[in-house]
Amino acid sequence: MPDLQYMCNMDWAEKYRPQHLDEILGNAAAVKQMALWAQTWTADSAPLLLIGKPGIGKTSAALALARDMNWEVLELNASDARTKAVIERIAGNSASTASLFGASRKMVIIDEADNLEGNADRGGARAIADLLKTAKQPVLLIANDAYGVSDSIRRICETVQFNIGYTISFILI
């Protein structure tokens, strides 16, 4: 039974976040491309780069994909220090070792990959490019602006475009 007090205090977006890919409305081609990438993933597969406007569902789709695949998640975003040392220590270890919790794989999610500049992320873009070349686990990057992502990172990745669209659903009674 879910923890009702926890659910009552949850942020609306978290409370209603899609838990599985089939719960995502819109961006059917992007969702299909993500699922195919995950189902055929090998250690030689390119990392996935999700591109799209803020709030369109990229992070929700990434988390739903991990849940569908029973993959443990390590998420790094702009609120985390993403220096070279931190990326090598945390993400590097996760991308090259097996899961501790029985999940078949660990997916490293690097959110806001188009914001890897400045003092807080010193050396981060280079460390991520190195990580992507050596990862033995699935790595997924998320960005609002494809051209804000370092060219050395963008060249390595398979890109998935999320577009703003309108979904109209009809319920037949």
Q: How would you name each of these model-derived features?
A:
Residues I171-I173:
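Conserved phosphate-handling catalytic cores of large alpha/beta enzymes
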